[in-house]
């Protein structure tokens, strides 16, 4: 198998309404603004998104962007920032994570800027990332894992053509020590 770092993966994904591209040096302010606006909503699901519990600073957002840029090049992770074409605004962050290159398979993850919810942007991005995984990584499956209580995320999975494979009961602990269930969805190339 070819070392993943040698794969020539496109660094831009275009959909009818969105541009997805890896984070770049200098994207920190836009990311910080979107995160700051969205923290109350994101923190409802700390069991799935533990990183949002930490203070989100301009510096930490810029560090995420620089690390994301490096990780994309090294193929350790494939993060993307999602921009609305019409207005040019950062509307979401999404990516292909925990890629098992030998299989190959990947997990799609995302969060949406609060002011951009309800527009179908995340569903559009998840479909595009799934197709990217099937076409460029030759993935045989793409997983989407979410907290069972995150109904909006479950709807994204279903609208994007993912099938619920199972619910892992008492799979995570939330910061308040409550047990949470995790939904495991998957999509396959023949469903793309």
Residue ranges and their predicted role:
Residues 1-30, 34-44, 79-192:
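Acyl-donor (CoA/ACP) binding surface of acyl/acetyltransferases
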Residues 23, 34, 53-60, 74:
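Generic, well-ordered alpha-helical segments
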Residues 29, 52-55, 69, 167:
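Intrinsically disordered, low-complexity regions
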Residues 41-66:
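Conserved GNAT-fold acetyl-CoA-binding loop/helix
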Residues 52-53, 66-81:
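A short helix-loop-beta-strand connector motif used in the catalytic cores of GNAT acetyltransferases and
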């Amino acid at each position: 198998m070819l070392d993943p770092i040698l794969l020539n993966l496109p660094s831009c994904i275009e959909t009818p309404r969105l541009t997805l591209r890896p984070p770049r040096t200098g994207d920190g302010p836009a990311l910080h603004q979107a995160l700051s606006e969205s923290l109350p909503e994101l923190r409802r699901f700390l069991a799935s998104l533990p990183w949002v519990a930490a203070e989100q600073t301009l510096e930490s957002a810029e560090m995420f962007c620089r690390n994301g840029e490096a990780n994309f090049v090294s193929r350790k992770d494939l993060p993307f920032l999602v921009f609305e074409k019409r207005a040019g605004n950062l509307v979401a962050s999404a990516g292909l994570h925990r890629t098992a290159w030998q299989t190959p398979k990947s997990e799609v993850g995302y969060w949406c800027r609060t002011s951009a919810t309800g527009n179908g942007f995340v569903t559009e991005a998840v479909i595009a990332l799934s197709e990217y995984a099937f076409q460029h990584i030759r993935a045989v499956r793409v997983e989407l894992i979410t907290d069972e209580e995150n109904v909006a995320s479950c709807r994204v999975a279903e609208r994007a053509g993912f099938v619920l494979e199972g619910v892992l009961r008492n799979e995570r602990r939330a910061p308040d020590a409550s047990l949470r269930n995790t939904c495991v969805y998957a999509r396959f190339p023949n469903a793309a």
